[in-house]
Amino acid sequence: MTFMTVQVVTPDGIRYDHHANFISVKTPDGEMGILPEHINLIAPLTVHEMKIHRTDDPNHVDWVAINGGIIEIKDNLVTIVADSAERERDIDVSRAERAKIRAERKLEQAQSTHDIDEVRRAQVALRRALNRISVGNK
């Protein structure tokens, strides 16, 4: 059976390293499913939930919260370099919910003062918090 190696790397080190027979990622152009023997590719990634079907258990799905980055696919090695990434088992959902509340407050303040840069920062923080909550609840 053909498989690919999936690695998720952040500035803090390797966050994920397993064999898989399918992954799903999200780029600015939309969602992309990747199977073994995929063509070589480099693409940007958005804040999203990465879905991974591992080869060792066909009924198990791993979820990883990816907070932007790039994906490189070459010779059945899928490398994701991300600003930050967390597996579902490592996410503290209550902490993520507190981050969501903080981001919502910052967004309201930035919108009331018409600070475009702060609005964008708060929107990114909110997307990241919502992504972590979603993956943490899987």
Swiss-Prot record:
Principal localisation: membrane
GO MF term set: ATP binding; proton-transporting ATP synthase activity, rotational mechanism
Gene Ontology terms: cellular component: plasma membrane; proton-transporting ATP synthase complex
Presence of keyword Cell membrane: yes
Membrane topology reported for the UniProt record: Peripheral membrane protein
Transcription regulation recorded as keyword: no
Keywords: ATP synthesis, Cell membrane, CF(1), Hydrogen ion transport, Ion transport, Membrane, Transport
Source species, domain of life: Bacteria
Signal peptide stretch: none
Cellular compartments annotated: Cell membrane
Its job: Produces ATP from ADP in the presence of a proton gradient across the membrane.
Family designation: Belongs to the ATPase epsilon chain family.
Subunit relationships: F-type ATPases have 2 components, CF(1) - the catalytic core - and CF(0) - the membrane proton channel. CF(1) has five subunits: alpha(3), beta(3), gamma(1), delta(1), epsilon(1). CF(0) has three main subunits: a, b and c.
The protein's name in its UniProt record: ATP synthase epsilon chain
Organism: Streptococcus equinus (Streptococcus bovis)
Organism classification: Bacteria, Bacillati, Bacillota, Bacilli, Lactobacillales
